């Protein structure tokens, strides 16, 4: 074989095995949340007791989505611009397949539409999960070993597939939290942005990262990592194109959201920076044990995050 030989054949190719594993894991994830599917509006289901809670159908029923109307003008939504678009898309698909989405919809019709809406969202999130898996497979260890490049530094051959993809497709977090909300979509956009950056496509990488940040501000941490790496390597022209594209896309998304529903957009900002302590955080544990409230938790968390990132950047420069 030799140390530089590259084994070939289906048994040495992680691609089909990763896709097959992703399908199995996602089917198990869907099966895990089936006890929370409510079929009769008169028979409530306790998702906490059954440990299969999801924001997706809950928000559909509680926010009035089932009665129609623009989601950007609905203050009960208060989601990021990208997530709001995804919610509107899933509801449109449900309506196109015959679900009753109108002010005349009964509670049972809203429940039926919510279940169908959840099914459409599961498909959308599965596509995002596949995008994450494929991106990691083309970014993992050995994916760019000895690849020839052109005069611009772009590889002239396809990247090799890495077995590191199984760290993602077999991750327990996917099984436990993959269907809680639409968070998988910003993750997919962020990972595909990294792949575009690795293929020397700064404009495309910036556009994808801007969309990812429009779906979740946590994606900005990845953009900050790219910023630090470019400053270390003095790749300023590529960094400029990357940041310009990402900033423009992010600003355009928020401007459109504000124009379509200023109150909803402002409610989202308030929930991000001025909301109370949320479930599943260390702040909730502190608040619950002390019996008091923590004011300005969003600003405290943001300040600690920015300070930590600046500290890491200073250590890596």
Regions found by a protein language model. Give the residues of each.
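TM-lumen/periplasm interface segments of multi-pass membrane proteins
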Residues: 1-153
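Extracytoplasmic catalytic-loop and juxtamembrane helix elements of membrane-embedded
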Residues: 38-49, 53, 255-285
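Aromatic/glycine/proline-enriched transmembrane-helix motif characteristic
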Residues: 130, 151, 278-317
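Specific aromatic-rich, kink-prone transmembrane helix
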Residues: 135, 185-202
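Transmembrane and membrane-interface helices of multi-pass
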Residues: 137-144, 148, 153-155, 159-173, ...
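Membrane-interface alpha helices of multi-pass inner-membrane proteins
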Residues: 173-174, 203-227, 252
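Short acidic/glycine- and proline-prone juxtamembrane loop motifs at membrane-interface regions
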Residues: 178-186
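Perimembrane helix-loop-helix junctions
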Residues: 221-248
